[in-house]
Amino acid sequence: MKRRRKRYSAQSPKWMVTFADLVTLILVFFILLFSMSSVDNQKFQTVVNSLTSGGSLASVEKSQQSQKLDNILAKVQGYLKENKLQHVITAKRDERGVVLILQEQVLFETGQADILKKGTPFLDELGRLFSTIPNDIKVEGHTDNRPIHTYAYPSNWELSAARASGVIRYLTNHFSLSANRFEALGYGDTKPLVPNTSNDNLQKNRRVEIIISDPEAQ
């Protein structure tokens, strides 16, 4: 009597077929996405490097924001150098973003808040720059510690606030910039850069600071 041999089905379990189909569909989907878009090699490499080094997409975005601020800083510094303004305008990076420090004589007469005509070319350059970026802008007015008491400006608080507001008013009046992006702050003599112990130091403390805000710091 012949022994019957058991037949084994070569057919895979149903769940494996379904899983294989799903993987195939996902692969086709990403191939289509890749073929329909142009890949920025630099950004792609940034993402790869970040993920392979234990980073995340959030850290990639933060790195890109930092690079954009560095580019803004370089552009402003180039303008200052080209126009020989480094002795009265300083540009730097700190935790707030890109900070521009304009000494009083760039924009104002001492004790006044009306913008001088000689200061408008730099404000125009800033207006064109701000039109190309989405960052919020803070404008701070600062004075030295010598008291002022006039009808228009009873104290340094009013003078510093009027100067900050005047800069914003000029930019929003001359360029298509939303006022919602701006914040005016008047600090009076409460935040000196240096001690008010000499005429040179007094002059350094009379200033306007324009901060191109870092989105990560907001």
Curated annotation (Swiss-Prot):
* Keywords assigned: Cell membrane, Membrane, Transmembrane, Transmembrane helix, Transport
Topological domains on the Extracellular side lie at 36-218
Q: How does it sit in the membrane?
A: Single-pass type II membrane protein
Query: Where is it localised?
Result: Cell membrane
Q: What does this protein do?
A: May be involved in some transport function.
Residue ranges annotated for the OmpA-like domain, each copy included:
95-216
Q: What is this protein called?
A: Uncharacterized 24.6 kDa protein in ccpA 3'region
Gene encoding it? ytxE
Annotated source species? Priestia megaterium (Bacillus megaterium)
Identify the main location.
membrane
Keyword Lipid metabolism appears in the UniProt entry:
no
Q: Which residues lie on this side of the membrane: Cytoplasmic?
A: 1-14
Give the protein family: Belongs to the MotB family.
A Gene Ontology CC term for this entry? plasma membrane
Q: What is the lineage of its organism?
A: Bacteria, Bacillati, Bacillota, Bacilli, Bacillales
